[in-house]
């Protein structure tokens, strides 16, 4: 969990650096990302070796490539889980890729051009990751109280509110709806990812987990 949390903290710091460094609307953000990637690559070389465990028995090509995991689609509950996972994955990429341009687009409207949301869209969006960090702490309680399936349903419903609040908000008088959308993101992302991981761990054989 600490590694997972600090990954999100790094995400937040990068968003703030891009925003405050004036790189939101230019190629500077790619150069910044490239430099960070090189630094992380250099750091990775200092990590201890993690040798792969070589099993005594010989494996077929199918097993070696992990293709046996596709047999899980024969199970109705796993097939449904994978389908919903892909759908929510699409939602995640939409919100990651288009949240900032959507807020920036309000800059073309004089009423919103000088608002904090338009000027600092990345900082506003980073509330999503801040919420994500804190929502991780709620998961043990919700899993114990409601179980894996209900927690997954809560996450799916949260995605509806995430996009609903986002669609209704604006950087001016409706910025509170944007903030609500960011706060709900923590539930939408964390609850499904963690409960989904537990579900897969519970339903699959150890030989095909990843």
Give the residues covered by each predicted segment.
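Juxtamembrane intracellular "pre-TM" segments in multi-pass secondary transporters
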Residues: 48-83, 108-110
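C-terminal ends and interior cores of transmembrane alpha-helices
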Residues: 157-172
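Pair of pore-lining "gating" transmembrane helices in MFS-fold secondary transporters
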Residues: 74-95, 183
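Intracellular juxtamembrane helix-capping segments at the cytosolic ends
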Residues: 1, 191-205
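Symmetry-related core transmembrane helices of the 12-TM Major Facilitator Superfamily/SLC fold
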Residues: 29-46
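Short amphipathic helix-loop junctions that connect adjacent transmembrane helices
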Residues: 97-120
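Hydrophobic core of transmembrane alpha-helices in multi-pass small-molecule transporters
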Residues: 1, 86-87, 162, 176-191
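Helix-to-loop junctions at the C-terminal end of transmembrane segments
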Residues: 21-23, 134-148
